[in-house]
Amino acid sequence: NPTVNSVQRDYMAGEISKDLTQRVLLRQEIVDAHNEGLIHFHDSDCFAQHMHNCDLVNLEDMLQNGTVISETMIEKPHSFFTACNVTTQIVAQVASNQYGGQSVNIKHLGKYLRKSKEKFAKQLEDEFGDTLDQAAKDKIVQMRLHDELKSGVQTIQYQINTLMTTNGQSPFVTLFLHIDENDEYVEETVQIIMEILRQRIEGTKNEKGVYVTPAFPKLVYVLDENNCLKGGKYDYVTKLAAQCSAKRMYPDYISAKKMRENYEGNVFSCMGCRSFLSPWKDENGEYKWEGRFNQGVVSINLPQIGILAKGNEEKFWKLLDERLELCYEALMCRHKALEGVVSDVSPIHWQYGAIARLKKGETIDKYLHNGYSTMSLGYIGLYEMTYLMKGCSQTVEPGKEFALRVMDYMKDRCAKWKEETGIAFSLYGTPAETLCYRFARIDREKYGDISNVTDKGYYTNSYHVDVREKIDAFTKFKIESCLLYTSDAA
């Protein structure tokens, strides 16, 4: 809401940061490429600050070992409600010191739900001893636990939507809902997930007292063998999730089976809305996901290459090479801007557990190399590019084959950069809510109305089939599924 003071101030700060970025911090070649729509240097309004993009918050470490928020020590919680309250405070602090989204795994709250249950049981034992039979005690414990469960989840839902970050927004946070039967607290996790879904179905009241769908937290629910509606133990949870999606559009869904195929047997959350990490192992050979992050994104304008190539493949590949090199240089600017940054720029991230536990004054450099964090190459307009080069979309040949070749080529280029630098470059289905229009507007101004390309006022995001294509949903999914696996970053 641009009439609100905090939002106005953030807009003004962002414009100053953009100006500094273009006049002082970036090479003129990259600035020109951005302004002319060859590439897009994402989030330049935050580039003057030493910020990274998105991450998976190491909530387990922060709750178990404590953290510090605004120079105040927060010790290990002893109840579910307190753990929920601390979680929302962590989320707000993290969001204020990065520009991308964050995700937390809700299973880390399971331990604290059990602590509350044990606390209630002890209270009853101390208060009533043998004067109450065990069945009565169990019933009272469950009643008290249900009240605390409801209050804790309500705290998360309402505080995330009412706490403001420094830019006047609600924190962009995703709750990862995974029923992992290898987890000691799986039954507690199931109870928490059920309550999250029930409260999301109900919604939150707006200023007029009407129940509406809250924007955050985003919910991501994992479908696995134990809950995929094929007789699994937790199918009932998935049925509630489906009811929730039908009414509130969330949760989104992740296939554990497909994730294990794609990520060396692992299942983990995206960082915020869509960005996924690459596999990385620590010194003990253990996979690590939480406490990792994305350094930043640069996107390439594919339709503009198609416009200039005019169906000539030799010219197309030459232009693609040149512009991918521009993207690489722009991404390395992001990387180098983070090198040498000290942990003091964001204590919640670098000193108190969200990502690391570095000392004051220590640089974050070791987390920028060797694949620990990622760099993302985004792309816009595979549909329009294919139409310009082959006269058809990626839904039919020869468009489909050409689109796959381009995707594979960009992915291979990311792999080459990774091998040369040790930085985890990967291909990214771009967050292009406005970029789809920006690129199309620039190209329309430069090249005029081109039928089925610039004349419609937008470019199609990443690998997707254009929304105007006369195609049923399942055929669309099938075609896109051949392309999305190349987009391993998002």
Named regions from a protein language model:
Residues 2-371, 388, 392, 396-490:
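Conserved catalytic cores of very large enzyme subunits
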